[in-house]
Amino acid sequence: MLRALSTLGARPLGRPPAQFLLLARGRKTRHDPPAKSKIGRVATPPAVDPAEFFVLTERYRQYRQTVRALRQEFVTEVRRKVHEARAGVLAERKALQDAAEHRELMAWNQAENQRLHELRMARLRQEAREQEQWQAEEAAREAREAEAWARLKEQEVLQLQEDAKNFITRENLEARVEEALDSPKSYNWAVTREGQVVTPQHKGS
């Protein structure tokens, strides 16, 4: 056998392998004639003790059951180790991914907070400017109203002073009575419900 294998190993390169016939022992086929010493021989199985057969069968069953349990335990342990190793790698990879995602989210959050802070400060400055402008406009409006009110009161005072010149006092009472008697203006008239002035009609007119 070793010699045949050595010849196979010593085959030069580039040549196809040659066919070798190796001797092998085996069972006869059903078409081969029996040996001369076996002609007329009847094969009888050995006697089997029932008790021993039962014991052997039970022991083989227990053996196969034990081997099956051990094999299942070994397979479970190997699978558990593989799962733990894979889970450890996956857990580490997931932890790295989570850490990277956390850093990205923190950076985005900081940038968003900065943007919102700038918008808030701009809005507060705009509101302050609008408040100052409104206060200035309100002060100007109040100043204009005060000035207009002062002018109105001044005109009222002047008008009152002008009207006071025509007031009837104790000193000019006689003169005003004489003036009213001498005046040709007639106050003998009436006003209708429609607002029309009705003057009396003299007979000679």
From Swiss-Prot:
Per the annotation, which location comes first and is thus the protein's main one? mitochondrion
**What keyword terms does UniProt attach to this protein?**
Mitochondrion, Ribonucleoprotein, Ribosomal protein, Transit peptide
The UniProt record lists the keyword Transit peptide: yes
Any one Gene Ontology MF annotation carried by this entry is:
structural constituent of ribosome
Q: Which GO terms describe its biological process?
A: mitochondrial translation
Q: Which GO terms describe its cellular component?
A: mitochondrial inner membrane; mitochondrial small ribosomal subunit
Where is this gene product found?
Mitochondrion
Which residues form the organelle targeting sequence per the record? 1-26
Q: How does the record describe its quaternary structure?
A: Component of the mitochondrial ribosome small subunit (28S) which comprises a 12S rRNA and about 30 distinct proteins.
To which protein family does this belong? Answer: Belongs to the mitochondrion-specific ribosomal protein mS26 family.
Q: PANTHER family given for it?
A: 28S RIBOSOMAL PROTEIN S26, MITOCHONDRIAL, SMALL RIBOSOMAL SUBUNIT PROTEIN MS26
Name-wise, this protein is Small ribosomal subunit protein mS26
Instruction: List the source organism.
Output: Bos taurus (Bovine)
Biological classification of the source: Eukaryota, Metazoa, Chordata, Craniata, Vertebrata
